Regions:
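Short hydrophobic/aromatic beta-strand micro-patches
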Residues: 249-251
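Secondary-structure boundary motif
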Residues: 40, 69, 206-207, 265
């Protein structure tokens, strides 16, 4: 394996020799930084080699055929996929929508392509200062509005955070400075408080439990994530309780629940703020126990409790599984489940919608903030913020949507236009005799999926009525 990596390094070094980047550094530094990042993800040999060589066909006189001859079809295929992703630039609506479609096709074919692109983009963002302002703005906005949400949908929390924080100063420079200014003092204050809480909980677990403790740490909220939360909290930092969240990492699942019990023994939990994402993982695979308590001095304090494996998966998402032995059919099944949303994106464009509508669909249904609601059986449903019971019903199945007569949210009757919140338990009341949706539902539905299914019903009805008319006459 190392011999192949050395061979790839030699090819990259020779091909890029004498080339410089806009930042003034040797060009070779970029594929090296990309490869270091991929190694952090614990990815396979083909992906590591593709990372080293990903710019060779585009930036040098070496061809993809030469790479395939020396390193095989798999490596060449990955590099070709990365090259396609590199061509996604805003050049008018039609070309942009088509390029996005190509990107989703490439990712659906082999998700490792986007892992390489993430690593490549993170290093490019770190050297963005050397580019003209127009390019800075385009690359940063693309990273913030396309790549970061894709990382989020793949459960790659660490990568999403890096992409967002590196893009933030270029896309919203004034807001970035403001967030930096107001948060600096608060982070320092919060760190002292967090250190105090860590001492208390560590003492409790060491003296009064047999929990196999791996790590307790305070994790500061990333700047862009903080900015997004401030927008929802009237820009009042006093309303942000998870400026520094406490993370407890343990060996086993049983330990997670034990730790939760000890936290609640020390401090009273805040009602409605205990979330069990171990028993009910988020659709992107995220698992942890979350609890919010009235901590020392009555200060609201948030905890995340997880195993080492859950922690790795929460940071690297779907990429974490490349480091496990469960490759084969299990991994293929997992990948298919995690990429279901991407197949929906491709189907949306195949419905011959206009480029403008397709891009609106992306922003509304897929790249918007997400909420996680539950069916009465405990299944987690992933919807965009602002979604209603109508959206929920059509997400389950077209028949559930068409026969929907009402909704119960957390055991209370609610209107069909009620905006759902994360953690809601939603039950759809079915009327088997109902003929279909009401036209007014098009104004209630927030997702393109629900709207398209409602329109499809009316289009079918219209065709049937025409057919009946001609049959009568």
């Amino acid at each position: 394996d190392l011999d192949l990596v050395r061979l790839a390094y030699d090819m990259a070094e020779e091909a890029h020799r004498g080339q410089k980047r806009s930042s003034g550094e040797e060009y070779l530094q970029h594929p090296l930084e990309t490869t270091y990042k991929l190694a952090e993800y614990n990815l396979d040999l083909a992906t590591i080699i593709a990372g080293l060589l990903h710019d060779v066909p585009e930036e040098t006189d070496r061809t993809l055929d030469q790479i395939e001859k020396d390193f095989g079809e798999e490596v060449a295929h990955l590099i070709e996929g990365v090259t396609k992703l590199g061509k996604i630039k805003y050049r008018g609506l039609e070309r942009y929508a088509e390029n996005l479609r190509k990107m989703f096709v490439a990712i659906a074919e082999d998700v490792r392509v986007v892992f390489i692109k993430f690593a490549d983009r993170i290093h490019n963002l770190k050297t963005l200062y050397a580019l003209p302002p127009v390019k800075q703005q385009r690359i940063a906005r693309e990273s913030l509005e396309i790549y970061a949400p894709i990382a989020n949908r793949l459960g790659m929390e660490e990568i999403k955070g890096e992409l967002e924080d590196l893009s933030f100063p270029y896309v919203y420079p004034e807001e970035y400075k403001w967030v930096l200014q107001i948060s600096k003092k608060r982070y320092e204050e919060q760190k002292k408080f967090t250190d105090q809480v860590i001492k208390i909980i560590k003492k409790e677990l060491v003296e009064n439990s047999d929990v196999s403790l791996v790590l307790i740490e305070g994790r500061a909220k990333r700047y862009y994530s903080l900015y997004q939360k401030l927008l929802r909290k009237e820009m009042d930092i006093d309303k942000i309780y998870d400026l520094v969240a406490l993370r407890i990492i343990v060996s086993g699942v049983d330990d997670c629940y034990q730790v939760l019990g000890h936290i609640h023994k020390l401090w009273a939990p805040v009602k409605g703020r205990i979330k069990d994402y171990i028993a009910q993982p988020k659709p992107n695979g995220y698992q942890s126990l979350h609890t919010t308590v009235f901590g020392p001095e009555g200060r609201i304090t948030e905890f995340q409790i997880r195993t080492e494996k859950m922690h790795q998966e929460s940071e690297l998402g779907i990429a974490a599984h490349w480091g496990y032995k469960e490759f084969g059919s299990e991994y293929a099944k997992l990948t298919k489940e995690r990429l279901k949303w991407m197949q929906e994106l491709l189907e949306e464009q195949n419905r011959n919608v206009t480029p403008k509508r397709y891009l609106n669909s992306l922003k509304l249904d897929f790249f918007k903030n997400r909420i996680f609601v539950f069916t009465p059986k405990g299944d987690v449903i992933d919807l965009p913020e602002g979604a209603t019971p109508i959206d929920f019903a059509y997400h389950i199945h077209s028949d559930v949507g068409n026969k929907c007569a009402g909704a119960r949210i957390n055991d209370k009757i609610a209107t069909l236009g009620h905006a759902l919140k994360s953690g809601d338990v939603v039950e759809i009341i079915i009327d088997k005799n109902r003929h279909g949706p009401a036209e007014g539902w098009l104004n209630i539905a927030q997702t393109h999926l629900a709207k398209n299914k409602i329109k499809a019903f009316f289009n079918k009805e219209s065709r049937l009525n025409i057919f009946r008319f001609f049959n009568k006459n």
